[in-house]
């Protein structure tokens, strides 16, 4: 795969030298071969999903930091050096967001994540000029496309939720970490160029289903009760704004139609996502209780944090 080859070539140029690369091959066809002694390959017989693959890579190493990087992303030579320097300077921060830029346009893909009142998450700064985020600052949590995690934090709160399979695992992990009292930094200049949705497609039935289902998983597990009660109403509002954005030729639903799919398919995917969440409700409630028991900040503090890094559902629908 050309994207993966470019990704690995970029890692070979890193100014930070004390690292190893673990590539998890989810193709089921042993398509990835190690390029050097620094690269280790874990080959799965089938696609086990993003969360499981990430956890395999994390368990395969004992390093104090874990850097996540999508196979369709290319890191600037100073990427790791800047992330590790930021981590060394902030021991209470357990995760760090990169300055992720969109391939081609040079605009931002993400400078951390934002969350809506229904549990939807979107990339902070998506489509904006990098100059808008030229200074390092705090973030809610990083996008898993290019992030640094402190192993001590992962040992404490757990790894990625493997039941998500695809999408939103980074938000779920980030919210669990914030509830446990860990901070998150955004590191300006720790630059990665990302071919957005190169691997799974920008707007497909697969993506629509998993994003909606995992939004529900994330909300049920993590949102404060008062927000969880109102989340369905905000979700309905988001569905309405999706229709409006589609008619205006904007947003993911418009992309879905341009890709050749019928918008009439989306309600069925939404229903399927809700049925899946209902089936898994006992486990989600159990996880919610576990997260609450391990919380180190109050519900009020957590709500204030979510409000600080919020995005309204109309904006979610338009992006």
Residue ranges, per PLM feature:
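Short, acidic, metal-binding catalytic loop of nucleotide-sugar glycosyltransferases
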Residues: 9-18
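Short aromatic/hydrophobic "clamp" motif used to bind/position activated sugar donors
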Residues: 66
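Conserved donor NDP-sugar-binding/catalytic core segment of glycosyltransferases
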Residues: 74-115
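A recurrent flexible, glycine/aromatic-enriched loop bordering the glycosyltransferase active site
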Residues: 107-109, 120, 128-152, 171, ...
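A short, conserved alpha-helix in the catalytic core of glycosyltransferases
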Residues: 140-191
